């Protein structure tokens, strides 16, 4: 099974924000995607490391598509998410990659119980790394329905 047209080996999943969740999933075995690592990073840490991650030829990228709504506008200016999305868009363009976007509303499918069931759980931080893992899980399930059987918990 091939996950996408780029024949990627890895999936880089990003939940952008002031604290950004990032994870890398190994897709070599389509029936058993494996979390390589997950982390929660600051904006500066993201700036320092994202180019090296996105530029890897065998890596596909998925990111949460953050939208400014009336409600988010009331909470804060929140430029970080949009700025980070723009940076990732540019780096993907520069690397000749298609960037996949996911809505925040897609995350609830990948609840904590499902993340733990397939060892996609991150310990520590404020939950942003787990949100990146949620986007990774949704991306994998959208492309491999067989893997969904493992999620029936």
Where are the predicted features?
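Phosphate- and other anionic-substrate recognition elements at nucleic-acid/protein interfaces
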Residues: 1-153
């Amino acid at each position: 099974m091939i996950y996408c047209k780029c024949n990627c080996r890895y999936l880089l999943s990003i939940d952008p924000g002031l604290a950004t969740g990032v994870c890398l999933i190994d897709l070599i075995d389509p029936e058993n995607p494996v979390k390589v690592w997950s982390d929660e990073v600051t904006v500066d840490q993201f700036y320092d490391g994202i180019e090296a991650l996105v530029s890897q030829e065998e890596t596909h990228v998925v990111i949460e598509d953050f939208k400014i709504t009336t409600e988010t506008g009331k909470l804060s200016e929140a430029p970080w998410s949009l700025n980070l999305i723009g940076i990732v868009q540019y780096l993907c363009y520069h690397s000749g990659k298609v960037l996949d976007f996911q809505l925040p509303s897609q995350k609830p499918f990948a609840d904590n119980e499902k993340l733990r069931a397939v060892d996609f759980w991150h310990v520590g931080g404020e939950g942003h790394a787990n949100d990146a893992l949620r986007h990774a899980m949704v991306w994998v399930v959208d492309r491999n329905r067989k893997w969904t059987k493992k999620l029936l918990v």
